Amino acid sequence: MEAERGLKFILTGLFLFWSSSVQAQQGFPSFADLAEKLTPSVVNISTVHQPDENAETGENAFSSPNPAIDRFFNQKGNNQTALGSGFIISEDGYIITNNHVIDQAEEITVTLSDNGTETARLVGVDPKTDLALIKIDTKKKLTPAVLGDSDKIRVGDWVLAIGNPFGLGGSVTAGIVSAKTRDIEAGPYDNFIQTDASINQGSSGGPMFDMNGEVIGINSAIFSTTGGSMGIGFAIPVNLAKWVVEQLKNKGEVKRGWIGVKIQPNSEEIAASVGLNAQEGVLVSLSLIHISEPT
């Protein structure tokens, strides 16, 4: 009887252990099928440019006042060759990447998922959002990524980051959306998606996918005190990129509207002229409306 009880106890223990193992496995999803489907739309980008001591390129071309916020693409040699990432958005060869990846580039080479290489031409850049559009002309059948809706993502959602960290193309990492609408003081349009997916030097310009396999962000920066991933990465929302890319595709540049406004203190004369009794507030005068950048 004692031996029988002992056997039952052991079997019960094994069953409970096996059950908990199955539950643990079910709690961590496999991204293998999704990664296999998405990787062909991601490309590696290599650029060549002559060193220019007066020109700020690479990681210094678009930086935050916070020294721990890094724009992160990998440079080799004497700033002559740089590596980054990008992703195909159309069957005719348009590719989105970061402006700082191709800034000052004299040659842009794209390596596809089949390891074939193509020479790319620059279509347009928008330094204010750190976005760029390039194009390759190839007879190969390309697999474009699907652009999603970054407004629909929620903090805690799973995401995949695919890119070319340290020249290791096709690297896939997973994480969650850690926060939205982050301002890292990198530019006038800061509205970053924060993630803990591991992204490193060379990943700049690569896509961030949701679990539907749609692009919801463009990986652009990391917070790091070491130069490597510390689990705090930032991506440009794809909804912003859609508008910028459309302008770059059609015009080669982004034209923005702006308003000239003059503000002056209120006074008795001003208050009387507009029929007010109080002297509180300020007077706002609309002077100019333009549909291009102010000079």
Language-model segments: residues:
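Bacterial N-terminal signal peptides that target proteins for export
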Residues: 1-10
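Serine-dependent protease modules
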Residues: 24-288
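Residue-level detector of conserved catalytic or cofactor/ligand-binding positions
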Residues: 287-295
